[in-house]
């Protein structure tokens, strides 16, 4: 079930370095929110903080609240592994397990959870591959290695793997940056379909992509190198691209910098 995300006064640090300052935003269920901004502005850092994935970096810490349907994911006794199961992540480059079969790639997370029933695993594999618009392309070669698929197919396989564990939210960190235009279009169409069932947050350097797929867009920027990134503005995507409220947003969208 898609869930709402509320971020309040979020500050992110890596050791003494203040990476992101004072971010507050809301992501509604069954919607797509895009984060845009120049390199190094903190948008991917914020994305990873939404499921505590940034904690794999030594000395990472946060201040503030990230709430999923009202429950702080940084609260006491909250298991980060459980958070990442509920809030899935799709990375910049497709990362299937290359020697593992297509079927086993999809159900790898379920196996880690202790699911062993073959009929259940097969059912989830088919449902997830259908959900990722990949089933018809691979149904006759499910036992072949996932690494043998094209780049676009591998990314959809990774999306199938993410949704197989029934998350409420999908985070996507530049999911099309390594793909050709045709594969990119397939992923964008898939994102539009997936938002019927999931809350989606995507980081993209492609502003046209943000305009095409998202319902709201947040623009991140930083004052100077070494300064923390900040959320400058977040609003309906149509408004951000047609009538932004901040000059910095307009300058970035119009290509004056970035």
Swiss-Prot record:
Sorted UniProt keywords: ATP-binding, Cell membrane, Membrane, Nucleotide-binding, Phosphate transport, Translocase, Transport
Keyword Transport on entry: yes
Membrane topology listed for this record: Peripheral membrane protein
Subcellular compartments: Cell membrane
Keyword Translocase: yes
Catalyzed reactions per annotation: phosphate(out) + ATP + H2O = ADP + 2 phosphate(in) + H(+)
GO MF assignments: ATP binding; ATP hydrolysis activity; ATPase-coupled phosphate ion transmembrane transporter activity
Source organism superkingdom: Bacteria
Function in brief: Part of the ABC transporter complex PstSACB involved in phosphate import. Responsible for energy coupling to the transport system.
Similarity section: Belongs to the ABC transporter superfamily. Phosphate importer (TC 3.A.1.7) family.
Name recorded for this polypeptide: Phosphate import ATP-binding protein PstB
Species the sequence originates in: Nocardia farcinica (strain IFM 10152)
Gene encoding the protein: pstB
């Amino acid at each position: 079930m898609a869930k709402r995300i509320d971020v309040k006064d979020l500050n992110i640090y890596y050791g003494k370095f203040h990476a992101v300052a004072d971010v507050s935003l809301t992501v509604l269920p069954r919607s797509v929110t895009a984060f845009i901004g120049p390199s190094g502005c903190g948008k991917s850092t914020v994305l990873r903080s939404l499921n505590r994935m940034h904690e794999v970096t030594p000395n990472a810490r946060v201040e503030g609240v990230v709430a999923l349907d009202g429950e702080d994911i940084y609260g006491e006794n909250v298991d980060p592994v459980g958070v990442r199961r509920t809030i899935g992540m799709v990375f910049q480059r497709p990362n299937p397990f290359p020697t593992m079969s297509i079927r086993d790639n999809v159900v790898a997370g379920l196996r880690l959870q202790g699911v062993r029933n073959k009929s259940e695993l097969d059912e989830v594999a088919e449902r997830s591959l259908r959900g990722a618009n990949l089933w018809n392309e691979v149904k006759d070669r499910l036992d072949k290695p996932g690494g043998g698929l094209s780049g676009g197919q591998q990314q959809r396989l990774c999306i199938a793997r993410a949704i197989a564990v029934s998350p409420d939210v999908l985070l996507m960190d530049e999911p099309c940056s390594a793909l050709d235009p045709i594969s990119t279009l397939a992923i964008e169409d898939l994102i539009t379909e997936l938002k019927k069932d999931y809350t989606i947050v995507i980081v993209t350097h492609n502003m046209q992509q943000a305009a095409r797929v998202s319902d709201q867009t947040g623009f991140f920027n930083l004052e100077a190198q070494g300064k923390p990134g900040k959320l400058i503005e977040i609003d309906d995507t149509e408004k951000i691209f047609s009538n932004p409220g901040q000059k910095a947003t307009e300058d970035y969208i119009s290509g004056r910098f970035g």
